[in-house]
Amino acid sequence: MAMNHHQRRSVPRLLTPIALSIVLSACSTQPSSPDVVDITAQPLLTAQTYLMRADASQGNQQNDWLIMALKAAIEENNPDQAQLLIMRLAKQPLTPTQQAQWQLLRAQLLANTEQYQEALEQLSFQANWSLPQVQWQQYHQLRADIFTALDRSFDSTRELVALYGLSSNKDKEALADQIWANLNHYSASKIIKLSTEPDEAQLDGWLQLAIYMKTLGSDLPQLKNTLEKWLAENPQHPAAIYTPKAITDILALEIVKPTNTALLLPLTGKFAKQAQFIRDGFVFAMMNDADRQTNATLTIIDTNAETLESVDAILTSKQIDFVVGPLIKGNIEKLQQFQQSRGQMIPTLALNIPDQIDTTAGACYLALSPEQEVAQAAKHLFTQGYRYPLILAPQNAYGERVVEAFNEEWRRYSKNKVAVNLFGDKRQLQRNINSIFGLQDSQQNIAQMESLLGMGLESQPRSRRDIDAVYIVANSSELTLIKPFIEVAINPDTRPPKLFSNSNSNTGGRQYEDLSGVTYSDIPLLIQPAPSIKEQLTQIWPESSNAERRLQALGMDAYRLMVELPQMKIVEGYTIDGQTGVLSIDEQCVVQREISWAEHGVR
């Protein structure tokens, strides 16, 4: 799953439209007479001018002018003068309104320098204070912004709910959107742990809706019925008045299963074997679907035996309402262009990812992408606490692609540079590894010292200590060579890096070399399969290799996604437990696969 890398945000940059509205409402022009001071208004003069007026006044009016001077000093970005004014006001007897404004300004000054916790501690309005409404609005808005900066979304939401009750109708819709966005930051596992107080009925309603959306997404009919019932029972709740778009989209969704499906694969030619395994997995899933419609049809088309025109004619004559495939990138693009020229776009799940995705084509994309797998590895290594990885990959175009994918994902989480080595000739492999870990440099330094001194040194070559994880893109035989080379290159008194590998190393065959301690990634079907599925597959295809199982799993997931994609497009964060991974979609409708991890030699 995608990991959120939180960053504290500056409160001034978080000025929401609602906050701006509150500020503007307090910006009424101050009277020309200096006898009347509205301390909730924005400063129109300089801090020095207000200070001169304060020095010419006394009592409450003097305090009012000091507060306006403090406001102006903060606006002028003069923290030193602001701090002096805060200290001066601290010695004065203040009315509740002055005390409230003083708290707001102290907190804002601290928030401006990202001292958020200290800012929060300044804000302690008393419930019995009789204050102008704008001060209560500013109080809740500032607390909401500070909580947001502290990544405390639920506390921020609590403040926004309080602000909602004090706001004008023109601000309420934007506030409702902000409340909903805050709650959507939470995952299903975290949101169910949140709770409200007995007197927080409005917040509790928002929370309940968010929990429904996060936990019932896998059963869309139940989610739809639950939402409809809740909204009918709570017609005056802000969520019923300003219903979030994510909810209205679900309420408007008509759940329709495809009736006539076409499976487009190159069943002859270069990729015939791969296509046949995908077909087998698709049909296997279809035959195991207890909810399959009795009138459902499947048309399998060999894309190498038909022209584009004849494929289109078959789709039309068979009244196809969903297409799975093609498998070849070029065929995907050609079919999309042909359908667009005809103005007939059939919902499609392509079984590859084109280099350039046409977002107007309305298609989704599923593939066993090596780039997706190594990107997952980069994320996994970081979440496991590793900070200085090395990636070893073949010295070819494939190796360069996966290294680029690993680097791109790693940069999302860390500024540390990834060490990279591409291996080619296996005879050079040990030399490459020694070079990576600095062993050759260490040996050369020792030789130079011995030459200079004219005598032998009792010393041991030292390996570099910064690499804490090695991700190896290699098949099983390559991994059996690489692992001992790494072990030899590491000094006995140093902590060895953790070794990881991709799914190519998991052949499913007998391992004649010790690969224990190497953690590898692969699809769930090969790491933790459902017992019933594993038993059926073994009975039907007892001789299938792991590579063939992955293709069958791709076909199985393609069938499942036919039904699930409409929900996935609408329900934010919607995932399904597939055979090739935990499946979700991105903004281009490319299916993302969260793969599984296991250790070689552990069953």
UniProtKB/Swiss-Prot annotation:
InterPro entries: LpoA, Peripla_BP_I, TPR-like_helical_dom_sf. One of its GO terms (biological process) is regulation of cell shape. The keyword Lipoprotein applies. SUPFAM superfamilies: Periplasmic binding protein-like I (SSF53822). GO terms for molecular function: enzyme regulator activity. Keywords: Cell outer membrane, Cell shape, Lipoprotein, Membrane, Palmitate, Peptidoglycan synthesis, Signal. It is found in: Cell outer membrane. A lipid is attached at C27 (N-palmitoyl cysteine). Its main location: membrane. Pfam families: LppC. GO terms for cellular component: periplasmic side of cell outer membrane. It is a lipid-anchor. A lipid is attached at C27 (S-diacylglycerol cysteine). Residues 1-26 form the signal peptide. Gene3D superfamilies: 1.25.40.650, 3.40.50.2300, Tetratricopeptide repeat domain (1.25.40.10). Belongs to the LpoA family. Interacts with PBP1a. Regulator of peptidoglycan synthesis that is essential for the function of penicillin-binding protein 1A (PBP1a). This is Penicillin-binding protein activator LpoA. It comes from Vibrio cholerae serotype O1 (strain ATCC 39315 / El Tor Inaba N16961).
